[in-house]
UniProtKB/Swiss-Prot annotation:
HAMAP family: 16SrRNA_methyltr_H. Belongs to the methyltransferase superfamily. RsmH family. Pfam families: Methyltransf_5. S-adenosyl-L-methionine binds at G35, G36, H37, D52, F79, D100, Q107. Its EC number is 2.1.1.199. PANTHER family: 12S RRNA N4-METHYLCYTIDINE METHYLTRANSFERASE, S-ADENOSYL-METHYLTRANSFERASE MRAW. GO terms for cellular component: cytoplasm. GO terms for biological process: rRNA base methylation. It catalyses: cytidine(1402) in 16S rRNA + S-adenosyl-L-methionine = N(4)-methylcytidine(1402) in 16S rRNA + S-adenosyl-L-homocysteine + H(+). InterPro entries: RsmH, SAM-dep_MeTrfase_MraW_recog, SAM-dependent_MTases_sf. GO terms for molecular function: rRNA (cytosine-N4-)-methyltransferase activity. This is Ribosomal RNA small subunit methyltransferase H.
Length: 310
């Protein structure tokens, strides 16, 4: 099982620098994946709780990190439920937490997961084994809602014609798999408008994956829970791979680090509020040229972090 889930952790050195793992610290890896980030934290003496809703990832990471014994604990859960997980474990907070967002390389490579358009696979796209599959989503929503998803989550300029073509195929009961869906999407986009560096279905597949897994909702819940999840002095780090995620992280972290809650048109602060968080990264940290050369997936990764100061 563990051999099926080999994943190169991005920005590994930077994550260690931000979270400062050390003996006595308890850290929460909200997106355990193959266990790469957690292993780095354990190697430096920290205790780690790893969350993942993908049973394959959980099994692989558990096998990989078994040598750490009681210092590591794996929990099958969505990182959006971090606060509830800690409560169930009898914990009031952690000294650091990390999420590495998006889909992992093993999930993309396993055709039966339905994430990739390079090989035929079922219309699934669930990161776990619960919830609505992509096929069910496409049958349930109408063309207008599908276009909205493609436009908002994929920033797809041809959302309307793509939605029309996809719904036509779904409603005709055509036998669809990921490869056929990608072909339908590509043909709905004028050939001269095809992106130069990515497959024409890339944005659509991203949008559908986000919708199936409610990824932005999960991220919002994790961000909203940080004040209750972190101990004073604890740090939160988020690695994002597209603008929607990064924008949400940036805006929420900025709000956490701002003290004054007065209306912007008030000339003098009257609330007397003090910020409970401080920025650790003034701007997004990106991968080095060397890391990108070794792991091209790291090219779009952005790391942001804050610390709870009171």
């Amino acid at each position: 099982m563990s051999g099926e889930f080999v994943h190169a952790s991005v920005l590994a050195r930077e994550v260690v620098e931000v979270l400062r793992p050390a003996p006595g610290k308890l850290l929460l890896d909200g997106t355990l994946g193959g266990g790469g980030h957690s292993e780095l934290l354990l190697e430096r003496g920290a205790r780690v709780i790893g969350l993942d809703k993908d049973p394959r990832a959980l099994a692989a990471a558990t096998a990989r990190l078994a040598r750490w014994g009681e210092a590591f604990r794996a929990v099958r859960a969505d990182f959006r439920d971090a606060k509830n997980v800690l409560s169930a474990l009898g914990l009031t907070g952690v000294d650091g937490t990390l999420v590495d967002l998006g889909v992992s390389s093993p999930q993309l490579d396993q055709a039966d997961r339905g994430f990739s358009f390079s090989r035929p696979g079922p219309l699934d796209m669930r990161m776990g084994d619960e919830g609505e599959r992509l096929e069910d989503l496409l049958r349930r929503i109408d063309e207008r809602e599908l276009a909205r998803i493609l436009r908002e989550y994929g920033e797809e300029p041809f959302a309307r014609p793509i939605a029309r073509a996809v719904k036509r195929a779904v409603e005709s009961d055509e036998a669809l798999d990921t490869a056929r869906l990608a072909d339908i999407v590509a043909k709905a986009i004028p050939r001269k408008a095809w992106p130069r560096r990515i497959h024409p279905a890339t944005r659509t597949f991203q949008a559908l994956r986000i919708a199936v897994n409610d990824e932005l909702g999960a991220l919002a819940a994790w961000l909203d829970g940080l004040p209750a999840t972190l101990n004073v002095g604890g740090r939160a780090a988020a690695i994002s791979f597209h603008s929607l995620e990064d924008r949400m992280v940036k805006e929420r972290f900025r709000a956490l680090t701002q003290a004054c809650t007065c209306p912007p048109d008030l000339p003098v602060c009257a609330c007397g509020a003090r910020a409970s968080f401080a920025a650790i990264t003034r701007k997004a940290v990106v991968a080095s040229e060397a890391e990108v050369a070794e792991n091209p997936r790291a090219r779009s990764a952005k790391l942001r972090a804050v610390e709870k100061i009171r």
